[in-house]
Swiss-Prot record:
Name assigned to this protein: Beta-hexosaminidase
Temperature dependence: Optimum temperature is 45 degrees Celsius.
Residues annotated for substrate binding in this entry: D62, R70, R130, K160, H161
Listed InterPro entries: Beta_hexosaminidase_bac, Glyco_hydro_3_AS, Glyco_hydro_3_N, Glyco_hydro_3_N_sf, Glycoside_hydrolase_SF, NagZ_Beta-hexosaminidase
Entries under HAMAP family matching the protein: NagZ
Keyword match Chloroplast: no
Activity-pH behavior: Optimum pH is 7.0.
Pathway(s) the chain acts in: Cell wall biogenesis; peptidoglycan recycling
Gene Ontology BP annotations: carbohydrate metabolic process; cell division; cell wall organization; peptidoglycan biosynthetic process; peptidoglycan turnover; regulation of cell shape
Cited function: Plays a role in peptidoglycan recycling by cleaving the terminal beta-1,4-linked N-acetylglucosamine (GlcNAc) from peptide-linked peptidoglycan fragments, giving rise to free GlcNAc, anhydro-N-acetylmuramic acid and anhydro-N-acetylmuramic acid-linked peptides. Hydrolyzes rapidly p-nitrophenyl-N-acetyl-beta-D-glucosaminide (PNP-beta-GlcNAc) and 4-methylumbelliferyl-beta-GlcNAc, and slightly active on p-nitrophenyl-beta-GalNAc. May play a role in signal transduction between host and organism.
Subcellular location: Cytoplasm
PANTHER family noted in UniProt: BETA-HEXOSAMINIDASE, BETA-HEXOSAMINIDASE-RELATED
Chief site of localization: cytoplasm
Originating gene: nagZ
């Protein structure tokens, strides 16, 4: 597997998609709502992606729940993370949410959902109800349960957005936010605890600048990724960049410069989404390399959607989560 994640055009592969997927620098494909029409089509698309790559490749999606759920019709509704803490049995429901989300993706030959959000607080426009809580203990309690659910069915976990995106109001999809606080120790407590618990397989840093600490966005900062994440916190898993086509990454230069800076800073894999010319520029200019440890993120189970929906576990989780959503809609 190479270090670059990119997207494909639609519900079926184009000739250009196939050519690009065969490039050795490509290590992953991230899917969007436009890639989904129905369950059978999605399964066929993922089979075609793996065949075109001619080698192991990761397939991922943002399917964390609430407003960030790319596949809707034909999939169970997953609650927004904020809802779990509002229920008496929220810990079990959070575990059900992680399990159900992961199981349904695995049944469609998808390896990863980039989840969960470990950011604290609801004020940031980009985060909002994607956060599990606005205090450290609430985030730890419910994110841990959600990740237990994911891992129990064979999906790796990705914590985001290190070292904490929740306190900035600006949206890093649209601009580069600055977190002007003197200390982000509270936010860091969450990431530290989940690393020490050994429950995180991958990490996604924020396109946020913390000027009190460093002048670069965390996603392109050796200080945050090498010194803090790797050395001080001892994180051993895969580090993804967030989408480098987002405006929050523009401060790092053009597409190839962004990718190279992120890799040099300590990212293992980089995402370049929804701008094909940018992805091609990275393929053309990035030296060919492999990320052997990324194979550990491939899904650990295999079953069909029909088999999954026939289980009592699926029926119980589906009904419990639907009741939670209905109670707060």
């Amino acid at each position: 597997m190479g270090p670059l994640w990119l997207d494909v055009e639609g519900c079926e592969l184009t000739a250009e998609d196939r050519e690009i997927l065969a490039h050795p620098t490509v290590g992953g494909v991230i899917l969007f709502a436009r890639n989904y029409h129905d369950n059978q089509q999605l399964l066929a698309l993922n089979t075609a992606i793996r065949q075109a790559a001619k080698r192991p490749i990761l397939i991922g999606v943002d399917q964390e729940g609430g407003r960030v759920q790319r596949f809707r019709d034909g999939f169970s509704k997953i609650p927004a993370a904020q809802l779990y803490a509002r229920s008496d049995n929220g810990t079990q429901l959070a575990e059900d949410g992680g399990w159900l989300m992961a199981a349904e993706l695995i049944a469609h030959d998808i390896d990863l959902s980039f989840a969960p959000v470990l950011d604290k607080g609801f004020d940031c426009r980009a985060i909002g109800n994607r956060a599990f809580g606005d205090d450290v203990q609430t985030v730890l309690t419910y994110s841990s349960a959600y990740m237990r659910g994911m891992k129990s069915v064979g999906m790796a976990t990705t914590g985001k957005h290190f070292p904490g995106h929740g306190a900035v109001i600006a949206d890093s999809h649209l601009e580069t936010p600055y977190d002007e606080r003197d200390s982000i120790a509270d936010d860091m407590t969450i990431f530290r605890a989940q690393i020490e618990a050994g429950i995180l397989d991958a990490m996604m840093p924020a396109h946020v600048i913390y000027p009190h600490y460093d002048a670069q966005p965390a996603s392109g900062s050796p200080y945050w990724l090498k010194q803090v994440l790797r050395q001080e916190l001892g994180f051993q898993g895969i580090v993804f960049s967030d989408d480098l086509s987002m405006e929050g990454a523009a401060i790092m230069g053009g597409p190839a410069e962004r990718a190279q800076q992120s890799l040099d800073a300590g990212c293992d894999m980089v995402l370049m989404c929804n701008k094909r010319e940018s992805a091609v520029a990275v393929l053309d200019q990035l030296p060919i390399s492999v990320v052997p440890q990324a194979q550990s993120l491939l899904k650990q189970q295999q079953f069909t959607y029909r088999e999954l929906k026939a289980t009592e576990r699926w029926k119980q989780a589906y009904q419990a989560l639907q009741r939670l959503i209905d109670a707060h809609s």
